[in-house]
Amino acid sequence: MNGDSAGNPMAGGSSAGDVDRISDLPDDLLHLILSYVSDDAAEVTRTSVLSRRWRRVWIHAQKLCFGDDRQSRWRRLANFGGFVDWAFAQRGDADIQSVIIFMSRLDSATPEQVNEWLRYAVRRVVKTFWFNACDSTLIGAWWAPPPRDHGHQLPTVELPSHGRTASINLNLSSYPFRLKLPASPAARYEALTDLSLSSAWFREDEAVAGRRTLADFISSCCPRLRKLEIIDPMRLPQLVLRAEALEELIVASTRDTQTMDVTAPNLRIFELHYFNSMTSVTSYGESIDLVVRITAPRLEEIAINNSTLEIEDNLDLRIHGLASVRRLKNLTLAMHGHNCCNTDYGLWLLNNCPNVEHIDLRLRYEMLATHEVDDLTDNRAPRLYKARSMVIDACGLDQYLVTSVWSLLLMCPDLISLRICLRGWG
């Protein structure tokens, strides 16, 4: 194959032959045919062998997925990083709607190549850019201890100062990449509405002159950000957000984060998952108290889930303006019959969300001290008269299940839908 396919690491030796009827088709029809081709970038570029004109048609594909694990077991992509470089170079300055890069091996690309891809993406990708460095080894597992710097310079993924992409997803869980945010005062991501950052090293526990924090980047550079997802952040001791447009905030596996302070007047959904620091960077195996302060007068849905939570773990939850909340999800209640632990965040939310309509909770049996319980059957216990549906996930309650469910029904006298999921019952 010759022409524009030269230099393609994926180029084969076959040709289109003497008969080339495809080249006589109009551009609109060629683009329509291309839209039905797999979004796998390797497959898309291989269409260049079909005809003379098709050698350039693939460049107009609006969604490309690059993956170093997408090759068959009989043939592996020898130069993944070079192939991505070549494909972007062939496209030039043409815009594209979506780019996904999945890198499963450390030797698939250099940090310099990764940063060049990021610079290309935020300039040319209009809708979605997703970079996923997700290894299949145990180092990427959530239960594994986090990688440590040991004084060595970690490779850096640097976000450019300006971007026009609407949705950016950076999953750096495979390798210890440090995320560097743009320090320029003029940095702007005007079009960014969705941002997801997973397993990034922020190193905000160290004072560095001129470095921009995650909170400052979001507040100053992303005026239209509506959804923020932060998963397993490392070296991020505090997250102080002031975000006018933010509507959805999801935080998971906070490791060594000790303070979250969020003021978001348009926030509708707040989710917090696996928040105890069982894999803390600085004290692996030890829990660190987490203080969560949320000011969001329009908050409608709260989901707080931690299947590993113990009574001694300390979540200091301070959410202002709970009258607007209509949905509580993934709550944990520590119960013994009709008695419920009164030091738990789950009961605190039930007591302080009088207008909640849907409740999704997990029951857990605990032997509770007398001074730590509230009797849910007591006439002075709160009543949620607007609650209409409830989902209960029960495990290990045995003979206390019926009493516990009965007490919850008393708390929600106008309930019209109840679903109970029993786990571990033979």
PLM regions and their residue ranges:
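Conserved hydrophobic beta-strand positions in leucine-rich repeat
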Residues: 64-67, 99-102, 127-132, 166-171, ...
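C-terminal amphipathic alpha-helical segment
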Residues: 54, 305, 312, 317-319, ...
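A structural signal for leucine-rich repeat
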Residues: 119-120, 142-162, 182-190, 207-223, ...
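C-terminal closing repeat unit and adjoining cap/tail of repeat-based domains
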Residues: 3, 381, 411-426
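Structural alpha-beta junctions
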Residues: 121-127, 354-357, 410-417
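Leucine-rich repeat
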Residues: 2-245, 252-254, ...
